[in-house]
C-alpha cells in the first residue's frame, strides 16, 4: 500500500520559480516569553529547534533577498550568532510580531516585508514563493495565504477561516465557521488562513500607526485592522497546510507529521 499523503506531507512541487524584480525580506519575529508554551521557539522538534526549522525554510525560498530574525531576547540573539543567522535585537515593548517587523523595516530597505511566524515549524519555501508571486502585482499592498480547511478545523476557533471574493480579495477572517451552511448542504468549501503576511512598507507604516480596531479586538485577529481601515488583503492558495504551535499537543502533532515524512 502506498504511503498516506496528507495536506502536511505532499509530493515535491515543480522546480522553483526564478527570482523576480521585487526585493523582499523575510522577518521572523521571535520572542522568548510565550504564555501558553514557555520558550517554545527554542523547543526542539525531532532534534532541531522550532526557530531553526522556520529560519531554514525561509532561507530556502529563492525569491527572498534576506531572512532576519527580530527578537527582544539576548538568548535568542546568541543562538542566532552561533548559527550565523542574520538577527536584530528589537524593542521589548512591541504588542505584536507585526510591530517587530515594522521596527526592522525602518532600517532595512526592501520593497516587500514578509512576516514569517516563528512558531510555524511546518513552514516551507513554497509558502513564501506563492506569497511573493502574489506581491509581484504592485497594486497588492498586503498579501497572505489560505489552504483548504480540513473537517477537524472547520469548527475549531484556533483555526482561522477566511472568505474571499473571486479575485482573491479577503472579505473576512473569523474564528467562527464562515461561511455558514444554513441549509446543511454539506458542500461548502472552507479555507483556513495561514499566518504568513507580506506588506509594502507604506501600508505597514500605516497599519502600525492605527489603533487596535473593533473587529480586531472581538476576534483577536490583527489582520482585521487592515480591512476595517479600508485596506484590501489579497489571499493566494497553497496546498501546504501548517500548524501554529501554542501548546504541548500542537508540538506532538507536528512531531508526528515530521516523522511521517521520514
Curated annotation (Swiss-Prot):
What EC designation does it have? 2.7.7.38
SUPFAM superfamilies on file: Nucleotide-diphospho-sugar transferases (SSF53448)
Indicate the enzyme's highest-level EC class: transferase
* Localization (cell): Cytoplasm
Question: Has the keyword tRNA-binding been applied to this entry?
Answer: no
One family name in Pfam for this protein: CTP_transf_3
Q: Which Gene3D superfamilies match?
A: Spore Coat Polysaccharide Biosynthesis Protein SpsA, Chain A (3.90.550.10)
Q: Name one GO biological process term.
A: lipopolysaccharide biosynthetic process
Gene Ontology molecular function, alphabetical: 3-deoxy-manno-octulosonate cytidylyltransferase activity
Q: Which UniProt keywords apply?
A: Cytoplasm, Lipopolysaccharide biosynthesis, Nucleotidyltransferase, Transferase
- Name the GO cellular-component terms: cytosol
Q: In which pathway does it act?
A: Nucleotide-sugar biosynthesis; CMP-3-deoxy-D-manno-octulosonate biosynthesis; CMP-3-deoxy-D-manno-octulosonate from 3-deoxy-D-manno-octulosonate and CTP: step 1/1; Bacterial outer membrane biogenesis; lipopolysaccharide biosynthesis
Catalyses which reaction(s)? 3-deoxy-alpha-D-manno-oct-2-ulosonate + CTP = CMP-3-deoxy-beta-D-manno-octulosonate + diphosphate
Q: What NCBIfam families does the record tag this protein with?
A: kdsB, PRK05450.1-5, PRK13368.1
HAMAP family on file = KdsB (MF_00057)
- Describe the function of this protein: Activates KDO (a required 8-carbon sugar) for incorporation into bacterial lipopolysaccharide in Gram-negative bacteria.
The entry sums up its family as follows: Belongs to the KdsB family.
Which PANTHER family does the record cross-reference, listed alphabetically?
A: 3-DEOXY-MANNO-OCTULOSONATE CYTIDYLYLTRANSFERASE (PTHR42866), 3-DEOXY-MANNO-OCTULOSONATE CYTIDYLYLTRANSFERASE, MITOCHONDRIAL (PTHR42866:SF2)
Q: What is this protein called?
A: 3-deoxy-manno-octulosonate cytidylyltransferase
Protein source organism: Koribacter versatilis (strain Ellin345)
List the lineage, top down.
Bacteria, Pseudomonadati, Acidobacteriota, Terriglobia, Terriglobales
Amino acid at each position: 500500500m502506498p504511503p498516506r499523503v496528507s495536506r502536511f506531507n505532499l509530493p515535491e512541487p515543480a522546480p522553483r520559480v526564478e527570482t523576480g524584480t521585487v526585493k523582499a525580506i523575510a522577518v521572523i519575529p521571535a520572542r522568548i516569553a510565550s504564555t501558553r508554551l514557555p520558550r517554545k521557539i527554542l523547543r526542539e522538534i525531532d532534534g532541531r529547534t522550532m526557530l531553526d526549522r522556520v529560519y531554514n525554510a525561509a532561507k530556502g525560498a529563492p525569491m527572498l533577498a534576506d531572512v532576519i530574525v527580530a527578537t527582544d531576547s539576548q538568548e535568542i540573539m546568541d543562538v542566532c550568532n552561533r548559527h550565523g543567522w542574520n538577527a536584530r535585537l528589537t524593542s521589548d515593548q512591541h504588542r505584536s510580531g507585526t510591530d517587530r517587523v515594522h521596527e526592522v523595516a525602518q532600517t532595512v530597505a526592501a520593497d516587500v516585508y514578509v512576516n514569517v511566524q516563528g512558531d510555524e515549524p511546518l513552514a516551507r519555501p513554497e509558502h513564501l514563493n506563492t506569497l511573493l508571486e502574489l506581491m509581484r502585482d504592485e497594486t497588492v499592498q498586503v498579501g497572505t495565504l489560505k489552504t483548504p480547511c480540513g473537517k477537524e478545523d472547520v469548527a475549531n476557533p484556533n483555526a482561522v477561516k477566511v472568505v474571499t471574493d473571486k479575485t482573491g480579495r479577503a472579505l473576512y477572517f473569523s474564528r467562527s465557521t464562515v461561511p455558514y451552511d444554513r441549509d446543511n448542504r454539506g458542500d461548502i468549501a472552507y479555507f483556513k488562513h495561514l499566518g504568513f503576511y507580506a506588506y509594502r512598507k507604506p501600508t505597514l507604516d500605516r497599519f502600525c500607526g492605527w489603533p487596535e480596531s473593533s473587529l480586531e479586538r472581538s476576534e483577536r485577529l490583527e489582520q482585521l485592522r487592515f480591512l476595517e481601515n479600508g485596506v484590501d488583503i489579497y489571499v493566494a492558495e497553497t496546498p501546504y497546510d501548517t500548524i501554529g504551535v501554542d501548546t504541548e499537543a500542537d508540538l506532538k502533532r507536528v512531531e508526528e507529521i515530521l516523522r511521517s515524512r521520514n
